[in-house]
């Protein structure tokens, strides 16, 4: 079977294994679309996206328009003569003329089991909500937000200690496997899209920096999910009695009882509204991350003392 003529549209690290899978599956990836270079690092130099760098390494032409709403950009896209466009965390809205241009349409790799967690942050919201399973949905795109009919789905379990980065990586690899299978099925005419169920729709709102603040009046299980969901970004923190903003990079829920925000015996353990949270790795402003024992050596407070401002 002859390979398909494709464009790939993606931007962050999540999308790179998917591009690699397409390039290695015998398809012709004739163009990659990604977001424009952004200032990054201490020098705020313009940096190309991870997908941009990978596409250049693969020798694939790269386009990075700020928008696809203009007639010129849409005409350039249509002129590619695509069988299909594969989209994975691109970050730009695709207008209807773009969605309609490829022969087989635009196919999205979405990091949830639709219709649960439509939207911008499905990985983090699944962990935050305490879901036991996540997954990837390969769907045909339409104008609505992640509302299109589904082609393939694959599950990925969320364990009690799974963090956002580990789930991100597992879903990216799952997406890479599923998109190859989906394209094979589409090319052979043996794959039929199914409408999403009307029940079970939830939305994964975009992450905000202020969501990282830890409120120890909440129960420990909720705070544990918050740390696992929001590390590395937006990151979790609390205001310590020293006046510093202390980052929490890793934690675990444990048994314990006390006034919320006070220290309990057993490492850097903080009482919560219900249970306690042991802070395994923390970071003071401008300092390297340390484990709880190392932090306590510089913060000699006995159990019962308040650590949270």
Swiss-Prot record:
The record ties this protein, via CDD domains, to: FMT_core_Met-tRNA-FMT_N (cd08646), Met_tRNA_FMT_C (cd08704)
Please give the catalytic activity noted in the UniProt record. L-methionyl-tRNA(fMet) + (6R)-10-formyltetrahydrofolate = N-formyl-L-methionyl-tRNA(fMet) + (6S)-5,6,7,8-tetrahydrofolate + H(+)
- Residues that, per the record, bind (6S)-5,6,7,8-tetrahydrofolate: 112-115
* The UniProt record lists the keyword Protein biosynthesis: yes
Which PROSITE patterns does this UniProt record tie to the protein? GART
For this protein, the Enzyme Commission number is: 2.1.2.9
Its domain of life reads: Bacteria
**One annotated GO molecular function:** methionyl-tRNA formyltransferase activity
InterPro entries on file: Fmt, Formyl_trans_C, Formyl_trans_C_sf, Formyl_transf_N, Formyl_transf_N_sf, Formyl_transferase-like_C_sf, GART_AS, Met-tRNA-FMT_C
Q: Which GO terms describe its cellular component?
A: cytosol
The EC category is transferase
Gene3D superfamilies for the chain: Formyl transferase, C-terminal domain, Formyl transferase, N-terminal domain
Pfam families, per the entry:
Formyl_trans_C, Formyl_trans_N
What keywords were assigned to this record? Protein biosynthesis, Transferase
Query: Does the keyword S-adenosyl-L-methionine feature in the UniProt annotation?
Result: no
Report the function annotation for this chain. Answer: Attaches a formyl group to the free amino group of methionyl-tRNA(fMet). The formyl group appears to play a dual role in the initiator identity of N-formylmethionyl-tRNA by promoting its recognition by IF2 and preventing the misappropriation of this tRNA by the elongation apparatus.
PANTHER family of this UniProt entry?
METHIONYL-TRNA FORMYLTRANSFERASE, METHIONYL-TRNA FORMYLTRANSFERASE, MITOCHONDRIAL
The entry's family comment says: Belongs to the Fmt family.
Protein's name in the database: Methionyl-tRNA formyltransferase
Name the source organism.
Rhodospirillum centenum (strain ATCC 51521 / SW)
């Amino acid at each position: 079977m002859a390979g398909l003529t494709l464009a790939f549209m993606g931007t962050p690290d999540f999308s790179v294994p998917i591009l690699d899978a397409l390039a290695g599956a015998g398809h012709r990836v004739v163009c990659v679309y990604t977001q424009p270079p952004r200032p990054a690092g201490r020098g705020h130099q313009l940096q190309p996206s991870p997908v941009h760098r990978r596409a250049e390494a693969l020798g694939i032409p790269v386009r990075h328009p700020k928008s696809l709403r203009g007639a010129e950009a849409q005409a350039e896209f249509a002129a590619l003569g695509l069988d299909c466009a594969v989209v994975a965390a691109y970050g730009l809205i695709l207008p209807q003329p773009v969605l309609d241009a490829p022969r087989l349409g635009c196919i999205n790799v979405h990091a949830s089991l639709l219709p649960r967690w439509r939207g911008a942050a499905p990985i983090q919201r699944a962990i935050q909500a305490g879901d036991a399973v996540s997954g990837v949905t390969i769907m045909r795109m339409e104008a609505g937000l992640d509302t299109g009919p589904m082609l393939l789905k694959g599950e990925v379990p969320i364990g009690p200690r799974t963090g956002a980065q580990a789930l991100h990586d597992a879903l990216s690899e799952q997406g890479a496997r599923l998109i190859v299978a989906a394209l094979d099925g589409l090319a052979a005419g043996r794959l039929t899209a199914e409408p999403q169920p009307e029940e079970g729709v939830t939305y994964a709102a975009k992450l905000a920096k202020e969501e990282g603040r830890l409120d120890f009046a909440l129960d420990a299980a909720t705070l544990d999910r918050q740390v696992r969901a929001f590390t590395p970004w937006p990151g979790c923190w609390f205001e310590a009695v020293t006046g510093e903003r202390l980052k929490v990079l890793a934690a675990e829920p444990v048994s314990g009882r006390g006034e919320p925000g006070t220290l309990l015996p057993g490492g850097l353990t903080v009482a919560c509204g219900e249970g306690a949270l042991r802070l395994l790795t923390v970071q003071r402003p401008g300092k390297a991350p340390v484990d709880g024992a190392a932090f306590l050596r510089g913060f000699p407070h006995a159990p019962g003392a308040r650590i949270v401002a």
